[in-house]
Curated annotation (Swiss-Prot):
Belongs to the peptidase T1B family. GO terms for cellular component: cytosol; nucleus; proteasome core complex; proteasome core complex, beta-subunit complex; spermatoproteasome complex. The keyword Repeat does not apply. Pfam families: Proteasome. It is found in: Cytoplasm; Nucleus. The active site is at T21 (nucleophile). Keywords: Acetylation, Cytoplasm, Hydrolase, Immunity, Nucleus, Protease, Proteasome, Threonine protease, Zymogen. This is Proteasome subunit beta type-9. Gene3D superfamilies: Glutamine Phosphoribosylpyrophosphate, subunit 1, domain 1 (3.60.20.10). Its main location: cytoplasm. Induction: Up-regulated by interferon gamma (at protein level).
């Protein structure tokens, strides 16, 4: 299994646990939708079918995890700790851009030791909903982003289906359809779909179970 963000495109170490994955985030006016599948594997074995890959960094900021499960969670934990201190010093919630910079810096600093890619998405009072990619020390804001091993199967779909100005419900449907398509094609993605809709009012968590997933023409 090749992992997005793995140094030099290397293969996983034997027995290592991976979130070999489909993750996605979409901006809308007033917030973001972030989603993921839930399969975790070690080699050929599925070790967790319902792992939530959406990890909170702060009250209105989440990251989506891919790569080595342990490495990705370690980066998320370090970033959450730094952002908590940052918020205490400023006496106000951190910006989403600040969170993305923290994740980017950790990922780049430990690029030879940790194999993970985190997508950062959230809401703040200055810029509203934002989505950032942080792979390999890069930092770029996008209206939507996909990642993980399953993303290679859905580039055509998301490019064709994305429309600027979508409502929160349209973004949830767009994210659900894209991840379900990836889960159908990618053997390293599967399980259920976790969704988080982040706005100034808070975070709305949803789980799309297996019998609720969209069905496509070949099923």
């Amino acid at each position: 299994m090749l992992r997005t963000g793995a140094p030099n495109g290397d293969l996983p170490r034997a027995g290592e646990v991976h979130t070999g994955t489909t993750i996605m985030a979409v901006e809308f006016d007033g917030g973001v939708v972030v989603g993921s599948d839930s399969r975790v594997s070690a080699g050929e074995a599925v070790v967790n079918r319902v792992f939530d890959k959406l990890s909170p960094l702060h009250q209105h900021i989440y990251c989506a995890l891919s790569g080595s499960a342990a490495d990705a969670q370690a980066i998320a934990d370090m970033a959450a700790y730094q952002l908590e201190l940052h918020g205490m010093e400023l006496e106000e919630p951190p910006l989403v851009l600040a969170a993305a910079n923290v994740v980017r810096n950790i990922t780049y600093k430990y690029r030879e030791d940790l194999s993970a890619h985190l997508m950062v998405a959230g809401w703040d009072q200055r810029e509203g909903g934002q989505v950032y990619g942080t792979m390999s020390g890069m930092l770029i804001r996008q209206p939507f982003a996909i990642g993980g091993s399953g993303s290679t199967y859905i580039y055509g779909y998301v490019d064709a289906a994305y429309k600027p100005g979508m409502s929160p419900e349209e973004c949830r449907r767009f994210t659900t359809n894209a991840i379900a398509l990836a889960m159908k094609r990618d053997g390293s993605s599967g399980g259920v779909i976790y969704l988080a809709t982040i706005t100034g009012a808070g975070v709305d968590h949803r789980v799309i179970l297996g019998d609720e997933l969209p069905r496509f023409y070949d099923e």
